[in-house]
Amino acid sequence: MCYTSYILNCHLAILYLTGLRHFSRLLQFNLFNSTGKPGKPAVQQKLGNELDGPVIVNTDLITLTVTVTDTYGRYVSGLAQKAFTILEDKQPQEITYFSDDDSPVSVGVLFDVSGSMSGDKIKQAREALSKFIQTSHNSDEYFLIAFNARAQLLLDRTRDGNAVLDKLTFVQTRNNTALYDACYLGVEKVQRGLHPKRALLLISDGQDNNSRYSFNELRRLLKESDVVLYGVGILGGGDAGSSLGMEGQGIMDELANVSGGKAFFPRSPVEMDDIFEQIALELRHQYSIGYKPTNFANDGKWHKIKVKVTPPRGLPRLFVRSKEGYYAIPGAR
């Protein structure tokens, strides 16, 4: 080998080794966080950096999911836009978007697999969930989060409802309950869904004892988002009358109410089946209404919304359920 070739080969070897060391440093940076310690999966930290801080939405157009029922709790569809009145901070608003179509929904299923859901609770909940899926729109999009001591994404964005049920077939109940963390992750995930209409279905006994996020943080997030939460409280035996059972019911009620949804507490497997079917029907018999506030300002304040509906002549009073307001977050536009 000539001297020139020898020098060239040495240079190439040095460059190769330097590249390996550089790649090694890059790999180490990806595997370890800034403190030099092994990084945790996103859902094991405070549900990942992408969840820190509020969810910011474009508040130029305020969109509402509105449920209308009669005195017997039956869903009322087919109302015209002129039947609705929107008030923001007591001021009438002009409706710029209106639809009562049976449109598909992005649905996040949040399923409690903690120790308190053991025995018949989880079995009955799995069976009742199949009623929800059978009654839902064929184009609905699902994802599944199971939670005990931490929240874990088991299934990400599928139109196959049976895949959701299959994932739950062999799940075992154990450990504590990170309910707030699961809901927080659920809001973040469902807001990236394919469909403009978004909902969470929370299936739990409502008892949180292991979350990093607090109840107030989750409540604020739900008020900021356009996600409707439905809760099904799985209370067995003497749970309903116990202090923990009462606390769980109060938590689910409040989380559902601030989002414009509703919480249910079935007393039997038959009633549970009916409730899951009822939630699916509600999602298919809602109105989507949008408006641009007449005096919109990114002031970060809470703006109260009231939706009124005037029944057609000769019909009795109708009842409306929707979000009660929004935060106009600076920088949202």
Please place each PLM-identified region on the residue numbering:
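Scaffold/interface architecture of coatomer-like assemblies
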Residues: 29-333
